[in-house]
Swiss-Prot record:
UniProt similarity note: Belongs to the heme-copper respiratory oxidase family.
Ranges annotated as spanning the membrane: 43-63, 83-103, 122-142, 171-191, 214-234, 259-279, 292-312, 316-336, 360-380, 399-419, 434-454, 477-497
Signal peptide: none
Origin: domain of life: Bacteria
Keyword Electron transport set for record: yes
Residues involved in Cu cation binding: H265, Y269, H314, H315
Organism of this sequence: Corynebacterium diphtheriae (strain ATCC 700971 / NCTC 13129 / Biotype gravis)
Protein name: Cytochrome c oxidase subunit 1
Length: 564
């Protein structure tokens, strides 16, 4: 790692503004409440996402502690149900989706050379309505009947007023609706920003891969989140106003499953695609090479976006109410463009001069973990196998390998990669490596064994099991490693706090030395409107061409940079 990029002749060193002295108390809080600055909102999204990530992680530790040995330990069945319901919801709707908007809010306008997002006030509205929704869901714990306890999938009839009469369920539905509105607002903003605010010369096929992935994910959001919000309000209508939308005579549980999973499976790609984009930004910088197969990577992203709408019912194989061959085939098919992306990433690293700074280490953790999750997904796509392991811990393990592998590993890669751009200071490399290895070992120790305990027949969402079932040893291994995974956030939190105050100051535009996209062509942190001047944009690597002009003609001659 170098905090000092190679100097060029006539290169004017950017100056870092000095602190302006002590501000009045409450100034920061008022600034956050009223801001429409995409950079501050992006950091607020990221910080709050990680706060909710830690809350969801504590719930997970309580779940794992309860499953350490047979018999109920310290949670009742109802409390256990509430915890796994809120754990899943928090991780998906309060961490996974908002952290996408955190990175996209901060980085995307910089990458396309825009001064801000298209709708700054809508941006602020989306952030605050999302946080209100999350608080509403968690407020269920304060009600007499406790929080929602019907699972994060809200299956009916478990979620109707007869089986879940408490107010906590109503709070949960309100929270889902509010977070849905915030997500839709952010998606509209990103699509409009990309289509209308690109800098001169920034054609669609000169955009960074991260921007393409945010664009496709935002389009998916507009297609699925209104459906989730409407379907959830339908459940509320049944619960509170005596509606009969989900009566068994009208389709009941199967109708809800179709509506929910038509949202639920594309949502997995809303979570995955932006993080594919992050690793697609990290790998070329630390492999010292252009992205291999840029056009193919873009079309793989578009293919995933289209196919994501055609696989939802693979969650419903065991209902007997769907056409198994079609959904099995489509599930196998959607793995093809994802495999193409792996070849692009590996091709970029192939014969590159790889530098193992912390962002690249996290990216390799992503590649390994997500590959495992993808392979178990191929297994689950086969109905004969799925019949036996559906609703077991095998599915839990697969789900965590795909989502933790993408969202968490790539989020950490993004934080370590862009922290100097956001704050003007470097994170500590040694603490970053410690953080990575504790997380990597803790994660795989927790979830690898869950494949085996699921294959032995342990059902998910049960608070208890018998000693004679033979699940005890594997559950104990999983629980011990889950606490190691919980401990892994300590070096991360310490690293962020320490580096924000005392980290090595970045004095150049590009502390990594080989950045490609436009965010590396402005100061760290950027000025209020992002750029004092924009370089000429002739390819998808404008910052690299700005810093290494003598390389441009040679690379074009050797056809390393495409003419888009």
């Amino acid at each position: 790692m170098t905090a000092v990029a190679p100097r060029l002749e006539n290169y004017a060193e950017p100056t870092r503004p000095a602190p302006t002295g002590g501000a009045r108390k409450g100034t920061l809080a008022w600034k956050m409440l009223t801001t429409t600055d995409h950079k501050l909102l992006g950091m607020m999204y990221i910080v709050m996402s990680f706060v909710w990530f830690f809350v969801g992680g504590l719930m997970a530790l309580l779940i794992r502690a309860e499953l350490f040995s047979p018999g109920l330990q310290f949670l009742s069945n109802e409390q256990f149900n509430q915890l796994f319901t809120l754990h899943g919801t928090i991780m998906l709707l309060a961490f996974g989706t908002p952290v996408v908007w955190g990175f996209s809010n901060y980085i995307l306008p910089l990458q396309i050379g825009a001064p801000d997002v298209a709708f700054p006030r809508l941006n602020a509205f989306g952030f605050w309505i999302t946080q209100i929704g999350v608080v509403a869901m968690l407020a269920g714990f304060l009600t007499p009947g406790g929080a929602a306890d019907f699972g994060w999938t809200m299956y009916l009839p478990l979620a109707d007023s007869i089986h879940s009469p408490g107010v906590g369920g109503d709070f949960w539905i309100i929270g889902v609706g509010a977070t849905g509105v915030g997500t839709i607002a952010s998606a509209v903003n990103m699509i409009t920003t990309i289509l209308c605010m690109r800098a001169p010369g920034m054609t669609m096929f000169r955009m960074p891969i991260f921007c393409w992935n945010i664009f496709v994910a935002s389009v998916i959001v507009l297609l699925i989140f209104p459906l989730l919000t409407a379907a959830a309000l339908g459940v509320m209508y049944d619960r509170k106003l005596g509606g009969h939308i989900y009566d068994p005579g009208n389709g009941g549980a199967i109708l809800w499953q179709h509506l929910f999973w038509f949202f639920g499976h594309p949502e997995v790609y809303v979570l995955a695609l932006p993080f594919f984009g992050i690793v697609s930004e990290v790998i070329p910088v630390f492999a010292r090479k252009p992205m291999f197969g840029y056009i193919g990577l873009v079309f793989a992203t578009l293919s995933i976006g289209m196919l994501s709408m055609a696989v939802w019912a693979h969650h419903m194989f065991v209902t007997g109410a769907i056409l198994l061959p079609f959904f099995s085939f489509m599930t196998f098919l959607i793995s093809v463009p994802t495999g193409v992306k792996f070849f692009n990433w590996l091709g970029t690293m192939w014969r590159g001069h790889i530098s193992w700074e912390t962002p690249m280490t996290w990216t390799m953790g992503f590649l390994v973990t997500f590959l495992f999750g993808g392979l178990t997904g191929i297994m689950l796509a086969s109905p004969p196998l799925d019949f036996h392991i559906s609703d077991t811990y095998f599915v839990v393990a697969h789900f965590h390998y795909t989502l933790f592998g993408t969202v968490v590993f790539a989020s950490y890669a993004g934080v370590y990669f862009w922290f100097p751009k956001m704050t003007g200071r470097m994170l500590d490399e040694r603490l970053g490596k410690i953080h990575f290895w504790i997380t990597f070992v803790g994660f795989h120790g927790t979830f690898l064994v869950q494949h085996w305990v699921g294959n032995e027949g342990m059902p998910r969402r049960y608070a208890d099991y018998l000693e004679s079932d033979g699940f005890t040893t594997l559950n104990q291994i999983s629980t011990v490693f889950s606490f190691l995974l919980g401990v892994s956030v300590i070096p991360f939190i310490w690293n962020v706090f320490k580096s924000y105050r005392y980290g090595e100051i970045v004095t150049v535009d590009d502390p990594w030395g080989y950045g490609n996209s436009l965010e590396w062509a402005t100061s760290c942190p950027p000025p209020r409107h992002n750029f004092t001047s924009l370089p000429r944009i002739r390819s998808e690597r404008p910052a690299f061409e700005l810093h290494y002009p003598h390389m441009v003609e040679r690379m074009r001659r050797e056809a390393h940079i495409g003419h888009h």
